[in-house]
């Protein structure tokens, strides 16, 4: 018996030492990571409370990829030459910032300053940014809008674009009828990128429409998220491929298990590089009728024609190439579409300005959490009113403080979240913020007529944004997201009108309702809030 104890201790003691060493190494890694103090504390709490499970969770979901690039554009030769004027997303080398209007300004800079070719990258960027700032000022935008335009340009390189038309959709039937109509009218290319794509009734309709166009010679590329479409049947995929349709998976979990937490949440449909559909809607029948779980589904999508197409095209091509897709865009878009994008000149206040827009996108490996900055800046610049719609509401302390400061400054703020959740945990965590927000004068509403999936913010009826980004830390820090930003009173009023209609089927969460939340529920919600920074 004594010998057995010696043998066990011989194995157990070294194992314990290794175990504690791993925990210490992970704790140091967390402390040295570029993340918020709350996230650091949450991860350290998790690995010390649940050593084995916590360590596995951290290795799978906790590594901060903002400094360790998950993806990088794989372009060379003719690929880079053709798209050099489309790309400026997620990188800062000077060869890639000279696209479209940046390229225009660089050429003008060379004409003005003969030493431009000898300037350093930082000097060139500074010169170009100065010219861009002057252009934005000369357009005559109000300071409130101008600040956001400049921030997005400096953070992402996305330009202000002048667009011809838009149409907002507040229900899935109308949105997908429009997408299917545009697919039916496609002549050259169809590019679609979605987080969820099901083989249900809607999925079959879109599949059949795509196969029909592929047989007509239209070149089609489909980009699916590796997790959001993992249930897609082999037969469904085989039918698409047999028709000549190219399919790729973004961070397929079969090959990127350590990155399975980082998902492509974008929803983009590009038709002939002239039309883009984007917003909150995935390809699934529930987005039309609510499915089996919900009475109905409230969401927002938009159809746009105009200059903004170039920015969505750049995002799609980037994601496609980084998902192992072969480069074949030269034949697809060479000619009129790319030529028009290359020839774009800076917006001039003398020209007719229709619908001014910008794209904002970010992901776990982008230099800045730009979408979080966008939401924060919109709240900070508000003078009168902020309207927020999001199914999930899990902000960090910075955004909570921003909201409270705006409310205490006299800005009227209404926040609308879903009252019929699809996920319990974010719903519970959201409740933990209500007391301090209500105390600051912010109104909280829960949408009760089905599931609310819209992600919209409207400020002062002048600036608005909608897209894929929820008001939560997963969207800000972990997922790949994309939003359209509108500097248009017409579009902002359109979104506000729908917000007010949605209010009619909401219940207000006020102080009286707060008092009815039991101690048990408050404790449960607060426990889950502890780990919210790592969700």
Question: Model-found features: residue ranges?
Answer:
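N-terminal localization/anchoring segments of enzymes in phospholipid and broader phosphate metabolism
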Residues: 1-372, 377, 381, 421, ...
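Hydrophobic alpha-helix-in-membranes signature
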Residues: 50-53, 390, 394
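Exposed, interaction-prone extracellular/peripheral surfaces
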Residues: 374-378, 401-404, 408-409, 429
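Helical hairpin unit composed of two closely spaced alpha helices linked by a short loop
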Residues: 392-413, 418, 423
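C-terminal structural cap/anchor segments
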Residues: 411-415, 419-471
């Amino acid at each position: 018996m004594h010998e057995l104890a010696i043998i066990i201790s011989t194995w157990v003691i070294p194992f314990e030492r290794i175990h504690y060493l791993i925990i210490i190494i992970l704790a140091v890694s967390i402390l040295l990571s570029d993340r918020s103090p709350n996230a650091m504390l949450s991860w350290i709490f998790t690995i010390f409370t649940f050593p084995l499970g916590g360590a596995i969770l951290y290795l799978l979901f906790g590594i901060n990829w903002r400094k360790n690039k998950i993806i990088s554009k794989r372009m060379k030769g003719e690929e880079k030459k053709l798209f050099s004027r489309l790309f400026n997303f997620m990188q800062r080398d000077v060869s890639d910032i000279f696209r479209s209007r940046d390229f225009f300004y660089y050429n003008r800079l060379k004409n003005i300053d003969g030493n431009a070719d000898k300037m350093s990258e930082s000097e060139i960027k500074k010169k170009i940014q100065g010219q861009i700032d002057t252009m934005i000022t000369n357009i005559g935008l109000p300071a409130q809008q101008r600040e956001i335009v400049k921030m997005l340009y400096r953070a992402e390189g996305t330009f202000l674009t002048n667009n011809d038309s838009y149409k907002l959709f507040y229900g899935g039937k109308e949105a997908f009828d429009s997408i299917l109509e545009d697919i039916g009218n496609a002549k050259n290319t169809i590019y679609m990128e979605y987080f969820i794509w099901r083989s249900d009734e809607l999925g079959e309709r879109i599949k059949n429409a795509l196969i029909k166009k592929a047989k007509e010679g239209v070149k089609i590329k489909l980009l699916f998220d590796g997790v959001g479409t993992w249930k897609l049947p082999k037969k469904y995929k085989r039918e698409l491929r047999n028709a000549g349709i190219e399919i790729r998976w973004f961070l397929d979990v079969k090959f990127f298990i350590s990155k399975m937490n980082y998902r492509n949440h974008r929803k983009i449909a590009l038709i002939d590089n002239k039309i883009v559909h984007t917003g909150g809607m995935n390809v699934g029948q529930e987005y039309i009728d609510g499915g089996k779980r919900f009475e109905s589904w409230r969401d927002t999508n938009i159809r746009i024609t105009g200059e903004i197409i170039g920015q969505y095209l750049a995002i799609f091509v980037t994601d496609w190439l980084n998902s192992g897709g072969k480069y074949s865009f030269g034949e697809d878009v060479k000619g009129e579409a790319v030529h028009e994008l290359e020839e774009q000149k800076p917006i001039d206040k003398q020209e007719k300005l229709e619908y001014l827009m910008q794209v904002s996108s970010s992901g776990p490996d982008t230099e800045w959490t730009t979408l979080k900055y966008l939401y924060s800046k919109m709240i900070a610049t508000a003078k009168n009113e902020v309207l927020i719609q999001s199914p999930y509401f899990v902000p960090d302390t910075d955004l909570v403080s921003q909201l409270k400061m705006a409310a205490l400054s006299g800005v009227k703020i209404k926040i609308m979240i879903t009252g019929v959740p699809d996920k319990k945990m974010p719903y519970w965590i959201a409740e933990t913020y209500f007391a301090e927000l209500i105390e600051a004068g912010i109104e909280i509403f829960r949408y009760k007529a089905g599931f609310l999936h819209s992600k919209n913010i409207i400020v002062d009826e002048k600036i608005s944004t909608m897209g894929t980004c929820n008001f939560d830390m997963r969207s800000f820090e972990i997922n790949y997201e994309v939003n359209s930003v509108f500097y248009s009173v017409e579009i902002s009023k359109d979104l506000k009108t729908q917000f007010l209609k949605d209010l009619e089927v909401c219940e207000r969460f006020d102080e009286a309702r707060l008092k009815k939340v039991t101690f048990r529920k408050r404790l449960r919600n607060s426990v889950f809030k502890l780990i919210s920074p790592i969700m």
